[in-house]
């Protein structure tokens, strides 16, 4: 016979008290007991991408996957997040499994290379073990692993060139993510995994593209960003950068499938001013008449490049435009949810 309601409630309270005693206060709780915790974020460096993410940046304490073709801007997006985390007083680490990090380029993007923790591991196991130990220290704000494809299992490195090592990397990633996910959440560390694209052979319908490292990362990632270069930016006949499109293909903290476009300039990274012009025009703060851009009666310049240079030189105007865009769209450094707010439910695909 089932227990009476008061007895069941008392038994549940005793069980919860024992769980708190054994595993620490807050190990189990009723979801409605407290106001929903604020989602703390790290800005990406592009206001359009911050808007597409729905919360104003990359969520802290979560796994992020950034993937795309070669030279599409994956590492640039990750380094901008590192620079913004450091600018807020945070500590950042970069696991350079590809052995391709350019410190001079990172410095131009705003990364404090003197305080950046860098590791160039020999094997995939070593890379993920180092990452796990750094995360468990509780001192990190952001860690970047570049890239998943370069996390070569020890058995493959020590074996012969023609040996078959089916599924080794996938098992390695699955085990590492099982260990790291809880530690990331507890420490509030954002882990960015940069990934490469491969093509599945014999696919007749649908996209043949897939990412390396098995399926575990797709499941554990709270946000997945698909980065693509869509056109080359030119100043006259000289190529000066790329127009980049990022699609949020998975988002557990806000509705997914939104897109953002921004400029990545060679040697400079994401053009903050270019994003402000695009978003300003879209939301009516900047007026575009022919090739002229105007803000509150003041001419910014003829052509986007001149307007961008004006905002670069007049940071107060750029900051004012950014503030207005963020206020209109309701995004910022921290998104809080009041008890009475009705928020769209996060969608997990």
Curated annotation (Swiss-Prot):
SMART domains: AAA. Changing residue 196 to A/E/N: Loss of residue movement, loss of switch function in crystal structures. Polymerizes non-specifically on ssDNA to form filaments. Interacts with and activates LexA leading to autocatalytic cleavage of LexA, which derepresses the SOS regulon and activates DNA repair. Belongs to the RecA family. CDD domains: RecA. GO terms for cellular component: cytosol. GO terms for biological process: DNA recombination; DNA repair; SOS response. Keywords: ATP-binding, Cytoplasm, DNA damage, DNA recombination, DNA repair, DNA-binding, Nucleotide-binding, SOS response. This is Protein RecA. InterPro entries: AAA+_ATPase (IPR003593), DNA_recomb/repair_RecA (IPR013765), DNA_recomb/repair_RecA_CS (IPR020584), P-loop_NTPase (IPR027417), RecA-like_C (IPR049261), RecA-like_N (IPR049428), RecA_ATP-bd (IPR020588), RecA_C_sf (IPR023400). GO terms for molecular function: ATP binding; ATP hydrolysis activity; ATP-dependent DNA damage sensor activity; damaged DNA binding; single-stranded DNA binding.
